[in-house]
């Protein structure tokens, strides 16, 4: 698998992978991604800022991840929108993406990697813990919003 920066013309591929993963989560009862216009605009902006990466096998996009600096702490990178097209899940690709994020953090002089998961998504929380992330507890940014669990990993 190759991990490379997404280019503007790959936005539809990123959105497609996220939509398919969103459908899968909805089938599990996890309402997390909604693929709204805000998602489209946010992802487009993140691609322009070189924060979105594609997971590619044989020239086919099979996943995506966003890795960008935390607005409140420039020494922290935030991992979000980690999505692997369902037929490619359970093949050990997600740990490779997390390893890539860790290498990127080191290269950029970051000392912490952060991520959040919906409280209902036990498998993503387990993946993060298996890869050295520490559960920091739950958060609810605003009333009626999703409750998520924060995870952090110190980079040494």
Specify the residue positions occupied by each region the protein language model found.
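Acetyl-CoA-dependent GNAT
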Residues: 8-11, 16-87, 98-100, 104, ...
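Short, surface-exposed alpha-helical segments at coil->helix boundaries
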Residues: 40, 122-125
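Short glycine-rich hinge loops at helix-strand junctions in the catalytic core
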Residues: 92, 109, 132
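Conserved GNAT acetyl-CoA-binding A-motif
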Residues: 98, 105-117
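Residues forming the Rossmann-fold NAD(P)(H) cofactor-binding site
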Residues: 95
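Active-site acidic-Proline motif in GNAT/NAT acetyltransferases
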Residues: 85-87, 91, 120
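Conserved catalytic-core motifs of GNAT/GCN5-like acyltransferases
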Residues: 116-118, 125, 129-149
